[in-house]
From Swiss-Prot:
Name recorded for this polypeptide: Adenylyl cyclase-associated protein 1
Keywords: Acetylation, Actin-binding, Cell membrane, Isopeptide bond, Membrane, Methylation, Phosphoprotein, Ubl conjugation
UniProt similarity note: Belongs to the CAP family.
Gene designation per UniProt: Cap1
GO MF annotations in UniProt: actin binding; adenylate cyclase binding
Known tissue expression: In all cell and tissue types examined.
Lineage: Eukaryota, Metazoa, Chordata, Craniata, Vertebrata
Chain positions found as Phosphotyrosine: 31
PROSITE patterns noted in UniProt: C_CAP_COFACTOR_C (PS51329), CAP_1 (PS01088), CAP_2 (PS01089)
Phosphoserine modifications at: 34, 289, 294, 300, 307, 309
Skewed-composition ranges (Pro residues): 228-242, 299-311
Disulfide partners: none
Pfam families per the UniProt record, alphabetical: CAP_C, CAP_N, CAP_N-CM
Residues recorded with modification N6-acetyllysine: 80
Record-annotated C-CAP/cofactor C-like domain positions: 312-452
Amino acid sequence: MADMQNLVERLERAVGRLEAVSHTSDMHCGYGDSPSKGAVPYVQAFDSLLANPVAEYLKMSKEIGGDVQKHAEMVHTGLKLERALLVTASQCQQPAGNKLSDLLAPISEQIQEVITFREKNRGSKFFNHLSAVSESIQALGWVALAAKPGPFVKEMNDAAMFYTNRVLKEYRDVDKKHVDWVRAYLSIWTELQAYIKEFHTTGLAWSKTGPVAKELSGLPSGPSVGSGPPPPPPGPPPPPVPTSSGSDDSASRSALFAQINQGESITHALKHVSDDMKTHKNPALKAQSGPVRSGPKPFSAPKPQTSPSPKPATKKEPALLELEGKKWRVENQENVSNLVIDDTELKQVAYIYKCVNTTLQIKGKINSITVDNCKKLGLVFDDVVGIVEIINSRDVKVQVMGKVPTISINKTDGCHAYLSKNSLDCEIVSAKSSEMNVLIPTEGGDFNEFPVPEQFKTLWNGQKLVTTVTEIAG
């Protein structure tokens, strides 16, 4: 029931966005959402993209259903908002600074909503689908790039393929719908690249003759752009802080201003000071006086006392070690040194997430292992028939006792991979990572440590780029 309520709320927000888009007046140069008829060619071309690969992606997502369908609706909303921005750009000149940021804000917020949905549904059986979308949805941000938006979209498409390959591997021989889903989704970004190359090679093409685009009056600002009236105007400034002395202070202030208003005549009330009353001309008077007091210090605004505000207590997620379908979930474990998974099967996978200072042993033969967002994790396993992936982690140590064909290290700082004699042919694939070492067993039972290269040199040989490892003598 709660899931249904969440879906209804998300759909209401999406409808609110699109209604606000469609009601924005062209006179304000806000987001337009007029039909393609009469639109400039690049808006018509974008409509063709929406009607073909996007429509196919939505269709396949609906057939799969569940989280995939919900996620697709969010993506569709983002594309609709982008289409509206294209209409605006075709009619208006580009605004500067913060005004441009205001126009881009709804798209940015929708991108964040897509990413957040994946983070909130890490236990979903369609997690690879959600990850493919989440890792690439930032491609919608090409409209904010001043140069080379096409390569940026390609980079996001490549990020999606990291996860779509997993989807294909899991469903290729099981359910063709998922294969078609991958094809439809990736085609959105490949066609968007071609679209950008044709119409927006050096950035979003704005009108040269229309009025300057203004801040959106039809879309309220906030963490989530939704339906509803704009926020009320700010209230009146707070009244001045009353002083503690009450009517006496008021009377004394009145008297002070009355004296000031006298102008030059105020000096008539001053008394004449004779020489015998001046300390610099009467040494006896100077000796009688005490130490000279310094005058009042210049006024400085009092510094507010900065008392450390208590930080809101971060909600600690429950620790998990459970089998969900064919997936072993090991999550949020901290300072545990004796975790063991021994009841394994060949078709099972293990997903290890947000574990800190923890040691886990996986016995038997398993399909694949993923280590995500872990710190100071020790992982020991027997055999993996697929791949061991380490993503977004720090200080991870992995030891294979049997055999593993591939170890993938991505966005990780600090990884030690201890290989067994049966896994010396293991492939180590790394990207955006540092401090990686592979340890090879010796005859005496020890290990020899070999660092994985992190620095490369690329040269053009006249026909292609040639990349070699750069060795730094130390």
